[in-house]
Every structure is written in structure tokens, then in C-alpha cells.
Amino acid sequence: MAFLKKSLFLVLFLAIVPLSICEEEKREEENEEKQEDDDQSEKRGLVSGLLNTAGGLLGDLLGSLGSLSGGES
């Protein structure tokens, strides 16, 4: 009976160890994916901010050019 208990314990132990390793790898992959998503959203925010600023400056420039040409007529 003791042999059966030891064998069962060994089988359970050998099944649990790979599961814990797989869980750890899965968590690491999820963390890497989350970091990549954060980096991409940060880049998108930076690009959209630059485009908004450039659009605002261009709009101001065109507005001032329009007022100059309108004032000369």
C-alpha cells in the first residue's frame, strides 16, 4: 500500500511541476503582450498629438494668410 501511495504522489508531483512552469510562461507572455500594447498606444497618442498640433498650426497659418489677402482687396 505504501508503494501505491508513493507512486501516486510521484505521478501527481510530475504532473503539477510542468503545469506550474506552463502557467509561469503564460503569465510572462501576457505581460509582454500588455507591454507591447501599451507601447503601441503610447506611440499612437504621440502621433495623434503631433498631427493635432501640426493641423492647428497649419490652420492658423492659412487663417492669417487669408486675412492678409482679404485685407489687401
Curated annotation (Swiss-Prot):
Give the signal peptide range: 1-22
Q: InterPro entries this protein is in?
A: Frog_antimicrobial_propeptide, FSAP
> What is the annotated localization of this protein?
Secreted; Target cell membrane
Tissue expression, as annotated, is: Expressed by the skin glands.
Give start-end positions of Acidic residues composition bias. 30-40
| Keywords annotated in UniProt | Amidation, Amphibian defense peptide, Cleavage on pair of basic residues, Cytolysis, Hemolysis, Membrane, Secreted, Signal, Target cell membrane, Target membrane
GO annotation, cellular component aspect = extracellular region; membrane; other organism cell membrane
Cross-referenced Pfam families: FSAP_sig_propep
Q: Mark which residues the record calls propeptide.
A: 23-42, 72-73
**Any one Gene Ontology biological process term?**
killing of cells of another organism
* Start and end residues of each stretch annotated as Disordered: 25-45
* Post-translational modification Glycine amide, affected residues: 70
**Superkingdom, natural source:** Eukaryota
Member of which family?
Belongs to the frog skin active peptide (FSAP) family. Plasticin subfamily.
- Record remark on domains: Plasticins have huge conformational plasticity. They can display random coil, alpha-helical, beta-sheet or beta-harpin structures.
Role noted for this protein: Peptide with no antimicrobial activity. May act in synergy with cationic peptides by enhancing their activity. Has a moderate hemolytic activity.
This chain belongs to the protein called Plasticin-A1
* Top-level taxonomy: Eukaryota, Metazoa, Chordata, Craniata, Vertebrata
